[in-house]
Each structure stands twice: as C-alpha cells, then as structure tokens.
Regions:
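Signature of N6-adenine DNA methyltransferases within the class I
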Residues: 1-127, 210-214, 222-225, 247-255
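Alpha-helix capping and helix-loop boundary segments enriched in small/acidic/polar residues
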Residues: 1-2, 245-249, 262, 288-291
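Non-catalytic, well-ordered alpha-helical scaffold segments
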Residues: 5, 138, 189, 225-230, ...
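Short, well-ordered beta-strand micro-motif
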Residues: 12-14, 145, 191-194, 216-218, ...
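Short, well-ordered loop/turn and helix-capping segments at boundaries between secondary-structure elements
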Residues: 13-19, 234-238, 260, 277-280, ...
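Segments forming glycine/polar-rich beta-alpha architectures that bind adenosine-containing cofactors
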Residues: 67-207
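Non-catalytic DNA-recognition/assembly elements of restriction-modification systems
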Residues: 71-95, 119-120, 262-309
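Basic, amphipathic alpha-helical recognition segments used for DNA target recognition
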Residues: 183, 195-257, 264-268, 272, ...
Length: 309
C-alpha cells in the first residue's frame, strides 16, 4: 500500500513475545533520492545514512518511536524534563463536515481553491463570537487553512468559513462536523500546517477560526507568544521535529513532545524585540529582511539547544 502524496509505504511486522527478539538489530536508512536506491542499500552512497538500533533501545523511547539521530542525542531528547506540551496547549482545529459547502476561498488563484466557491466580500464579518454572527442569513469569518508561503505572518486571509448563528448551531449538532477545541477559536496563538515541509513556517493567529489541517499552539504564559512563534520558526525545532517524527505530518502529539528550553530575561526580551520587528514588516516585500532577523533568532536558539545540535 502506498500514499501518493507522501511516498510512504506500510510494512507489516509480526509480534513476538520472545525475550530474544529484543536483541534484534533494526537498521533505518534515510536520504533516498530515487526509488532505485532502495535496492542499493548495501552499496556506498553519498545520499544514504544508516542508523542501527537494538530493538530493546527502541522500546525505551517514548511511544516506541524511531528517533533518527545518534544515541547521545536520543538520551537528551528522551530525558527532556520540559516539553512544548507542558508550556502550551497544542490542538487541532475545526472541520465543517462539508468543506465545499461551508468553506470559501478569496480567489481562484489560492492554492487548492479550484473546487471551492469564491467568498462574497459583502458577507464577510469581523465576528469573534463562538455562537456565530447574529441577525444575518449568511455570514463568513476569516479562516486559517493550509500551508503558508511566509513565516511569522501570513500574507493575507485566503479562506473563509461560514459562521452565521444558524450554521454554527448546525456544526455543533452535525455528526460529520468537528467543533473541536472551540475554546481556542479566535484566540491568539501560533499556526503550524499539519502537512510537513522541509522547513516549518509557523504564523501568528489572531481572531481566527483554524482548520483541522492546522496545529494550533497556545502558550500558557501569554508573554511567551512571540518567543514561541520564533522558536517554532527556528532551525533547531525544524531539525528536532524531523528527528522525532520522520513521517509526512506534523501531528499535535509530536509537537507536544518537542524539548522546550526556558529563556532567560534578556534572551526573551531580545527574541520579543526581533519578532515585533518582523511583524511590522511586509511579508511579501520584506522577505530578505525577515530572514535576516530570523537568522538572529536562530543563533540564539542554537546556543540554547547546543547540547542537542
């Protein structure tokens, strides 16, 4: 069985209660560029990396996951006392039950919008009420959905979800819809696309409903929102996420497991100042400036996480 969008395969394993199986060697190869390389794993290849683990060591990992890095780093990751899930609520978002009926795009140029209706601009409202827009027959609010081309802040609102009171009442009762984690709708948080890319692009959410294709991160200490936004855009977190989760998705559970390091006061102030600068920039025209400030943040996080790098 394979999944075309992510080039994954399913391997069936046989369970064995014999203690001797714990001495099995498990080899994991990464870095494949072509399908043909699958048949050449015994040959020397510049692309391929091989990690070898005892089955007994894998059983010691949290949730028995494969952590693809050297053993010293595995110990540090497994022994992390504080994780993202300890300092933030990490949740998935809303599902209408029928996106083609209830979700609209700003224009046909939006990625993935070909089969969606275009929103009527006269029916867009600034409503942040969980019970819906009152006294209108049909109304829409801005909706965070899918990936972002930019870090820190999205270029524009590309998607809208129907949010008049009658429709919200329908979502709550409908068996197909998922009005899940609704206490976080319209709150200030961080959006990370569920589908993994080479580089995480985390963006700030304010006064928005967010889709189930988004993992929302909501720091428990409100003064850490900018710090967490910068952290999730860092090379360190991008690397760690790929280490602990080599699959195609950034699920909420994997993000919760990421090691968290508490910043000192000066470090927090510096990161906050840098993020304020970025948020004041134009995400379309100031790309190089944003990347330069983000690189300053990267250097700070590299020091904070230097024992794992």
């Amino acid at each position: 069985m394979n999944f075309g969008y992510s080039n994954l395969s399913i391997i069936t394993l046989e369970k064995d209660d014999c203690e001797s199986v714990k001495d099995n060697d498990v080899k994991i190869f990464t870095g494949f560029k072509t399908v043909r390389e699958l048949g050449r794993i015994d040959e020397n290849s510049e692309n391929l990396q091989c990690f070898c683990y005892k089955q007994s060591d894998i059983l010691k990992n949290e949730n028995y996951k494969f952590i693809i890095t050297d053993n010293s780093k595995i110990a540090i990751i497994n022994d992390s006392k504080v994780r993202i899930g300890d300092v933030a609520d990490v949740v998935t978002g809303f599902y209408s039950g029928n996106n083609k009926e209830f979700i609209c795009a700003k224009s046909k140029e939006i990625k993935g919008a070909q089969n969606y209706r275009m929103v009527d601009c006269d029916k867009i409202y600034d409503c942040y009420d969980l019970t819906g827009i009152k006294n209108v027959a049909e109304g829409y609010v801005a909706y965070v959905k899918g990936s972002s081309d930019t870090r820190y802040i999205r270029k524009e609102d590309e998607w809208y979800v129907r949010w008049d009171k009658e429709t919200v009442d329908f979502y709550i009762k409908d068996k197909k819809a998922r009005f899940q984690n609704s206490k976080f709708y319209f709150k200030t948080g961080i959006a990370i696309p569920m589908v993994k890319s080479k580089q995480i692009k985390a963006t700030l959410m304010r006064n928005r409903v967010f889709d189930q294709s988004i993992v929302g991160i909501f720091p428990k200490e409100k003064n850490k929102i900018y710090y967490m936004l910068a952290l999730m855009n860092s090379n360190v977190i991008n690397k760690l996420l790929h280490i602990i989760n080599p699959t195609a998705n950034n699920s909420a559970n994997y993000i919760k497991q990421l090691p968290y390091r508490e910043p000192g006061y000066e470090m927090l102030m510096k990161i906050n100042s840098n993020v304020v600068k970025i948020l004041d920039m134009n995400p379309e025209t100031d790309i190089d400036k944003i990347e330069a400030v983000n690189e300053e943040n990267n250097k700070i996080f590299d020091l904070l996480y230097q024992d794992i790098l």
